[in-house]
Every structure is written in C-alpha cells, then in structure tokens.
Amino acid sequence: MDDSKRILITKVLKNEVTEALGCTEVGLIGYAISLCNISYPFSIEKIEVTLNNGSFKNAYAVGVPNTKKYGILPAVVGGLLGNSKNKLLIFNDIKYDQKLEDFIKKRLEVKVLDGPLYCGVKIKDTSGKFFESLIKDNHLNVVIPKIEKEKISLEITDFEKEEYKSLELTDFLNYLDEIPEEIINLVEKTIYTNKNLIKGDFLNYGNDILSNMVNKTTSACNTRMTGENMPAMSVAKSGNMGLMATLPIISYDNLTENNFEKLKKSLLLAMLVTIYSTYNSSYLSSMCGCVSKGGMGAVIGLCYYKNGKNLKKLNSAARAFTANLPGIICDGGKVGCALKLASGCFAAYSSLYVEISHENGIVGKNFKECVQNISKISKAMGDLDCDIVKIMSKKEM
C-alpha cells in the first residue's frame, strides 16, 4: 500500500486505541472537572455540568473507579480530587471523600442537551470567582481552557476522518502485511490489558468456543461497569467497544490455534474496522455501538483469523452480522451492557457459518455497504435519545 495510507492508518490507531479507566464518559466528566483546577473544593458555591444525551446516558448508572459508587455525582467528586494530567485515567489513585460528596450534592446541577459529544463545566466559588472547562466532539478535545498541544499532535482532523472513511477493506488487509513496531506494541498492550479485566464468569455457560467467548467478554465488561480500578484499552473512545472487538477473538485463539502472530493481526483488523464503523456514524448514538461497531470489528477479525484474506468470506460475514443485531438501543453504560455484549458474541460467531443475501433488509452487498447502511440507521435513530434520557432521568439514584 502507498505510504500516505499507511501513515494515516497508523495515526488513527495511535489516536483511537487508548487506555481508559472506568466507563469513558465518567472519565470524561472527571477530566473536565479537573481542568477547572479547583484548589479547595469546599469553596465551591455552585457547579454546573452540561452533557450531551449520549454522555449523560453512559455516565448515569455506571461504576466510578476508586469510589465504590455509581453515576455522575461521584464522577464530579472524583474529578475534583484527581489530577488533570491523567486525562481519562483521572480516577487513578484518588482517595474518595464522602464529606465532599455530601457538600457537592447540594451544589451540583446537571443539564442535558442534544447533539454530539459535549461536556461543559462551570464553577463559581464563594469569592465570586468563575472557573470553566469544555470538552467536545471527542473525549480528549479540550476547547476550554486552552492547553498547549503536543509538538506532534495525534488529533485526527475531520479531513483525515473522511480520508479514513474512503479506505477499502483491502487497504486494512494490506496494512497487516507490514505493521509498524509501535502498533505491534499497542496491540500487545491491548491483549494483556483487556484480558486482565476477566474476573470469573458473569455468564457461566460452559467451555465450548462460543460459551467461552461470552463468558470472557461479559466478565470483562462487568468488571468495567462496576467501576473496578483496572484500565481497558478503548477503541474509538469506548472501552466496551474495545472489549467487544478484541476478547471474542482472544478467546477463539485460546481454544483453537494459540497463534500469537495471527491473533495480533486479527485484533488489529478488528480495531481498524471498529474505528471505520465509528467514523461512518458517530462516537455516541442511540444505537448500541458496542454491538453494532465493536461487533462488526469482532466478526471481521474472527473471519480473518479463520479464513485469512478471503474477501468473499469477509463480505459474507459482514452481511450475516448486518442481518442480525444492528438497531439495539443504547440506554447508557451499566452492568446490563454485558448482556448486550453476550448477544454481540453470538452474532459475531454465528455470522461465520451462515450466508445471507444482500436482498435481506438493510444488508449491503459487501462490508463497506453494510457499514454504511448500519450508519444510516444509527443516524436516523437520533431522536430516540431524548426519550431514553427522559425515562432514565425519572429514576431515583
């Protein structure tokens, strides 16, 4: 492949495959809070957090690392106690303060707006001084305060995203022929980090290949969603998408060939496809991205592991997957996400063994058409978020 494509793919991977502690959206909130740099939190008179629908959903009922608590309030408190240099690992090494939570609870207001990823924070202290931060469009894009960018920026521009979307499945396959050392290291880190989240069985089915996929993937998801102080390697800014895209393949390898080189290439392909699916739709939406995007990554990665660069088989697997799960709603980050990942495992594995014609529903002729069609449905589901948020907001937390 030409150098420009290889450079683009490498940059995208370095930007989109990152370590995250806890659900990405509580990390987003904590990071935004920490950017306000409040030296004495008990001086706060009022704190206002504005989130887009998707960020609100994902933070509302999910565990926050190092707090033993769930939801937006402990994420805010954790952010006040954390170091902004940790970014999405903001809750790493914090010592939670219950008295501070009781204090902040009376002064916190959460607002929700429609649109792309958004986390804005406004704080007023008792002296009348104001503090502000804003992260938008992606989880690390800090708009306020202005911070010094790294000399070599990893941030992906809109133009580069469009360039990535124009790539073909064959480009991703060709990239596997000569993988940069830094990307090999990134994939290996992903294997060890995500496997480390597997703690027992969330769903104990048995020891056949599919059951093992489900057991391992749901166990890791449950570990994340309950707020264990253990990082995951996120893909396209989602830890659960990272788990869905990688753990079924890791499990398959463990029970079949134990071929580390083939495993790394299969996982890398799964990551590339998951990112590709995300760029075609959005980071957050009314459709469950773990299933629709991470699941598409998993099925293509599994098919590559099993059949190599067989485009006929790869396109067939994409069609079968598209005929199955797309359309499942996202009602926020929570323990129940593990059950959706279980469905994703079943859909990904079964897609290897069935042929579905493109004449079925939204199924496309090939991988690219399938991703584009799922993306269209995802965007059309946008209005659902308002109703999902209304239902969630009525609950006592």
Swiss-Prot record:
Q: Which Pfam families match?
A: SDH_alpha
Q: Which residues bind [4Fe-4S] cluster?
A: 288, 330, 337
Cofactor note text? Binds 1 [4Fe-4S] cluster per subunit.
Q: Active site located where? A: 23 (proton acceptor)
Q: Which reaction does it catalyse?
A: L-cysteine + H2O = hydrogen sulfide + pyruvate + NH4(+) + H(+)
Known EC number? 4.4.1.28
**Assigned keywords, A-Z:** 4Fe-4S, Iron, Iron-sulfur, Lyase, Metal-binding
Q: Name one GO molecular function term.
A: metal ion binding
Cofactor(s) this protein cannot do without: [4Fe-4S] cluster
- Name a single GO biological process: L-cysteine catabolic process to pyruvate
Q: Which InterPro entries match?
A: Ser_deHydtase-like_asu, UPF0597
Family membership noted in the UniProt record: Belongs to the L-cysteine desulfidase family.
This chain's function reads: Catalyzes the cleavage of L-cysteine to form 2-aminoprop-2-enoate and sulfide. The former then spontaneously hydrolyzes to pyruvate and NH(3). May be responsible for the production of sulfide required for the biosynthesis of iron-sulfur centers in this archaea.
- Note the PANTHER family from the entry: UPF0597 PROTEIN YHAM (PTHR30501:SF2)
What binding partners and quaternary form does the record give?
A: Homotrimer.
Instruction: Write the protein's name.
Output: L-cysteine desulfidase
Q: Organism, per UniProt?
A: Methanococcus maripaludis (strain C7 / ATCC BAA-1331)
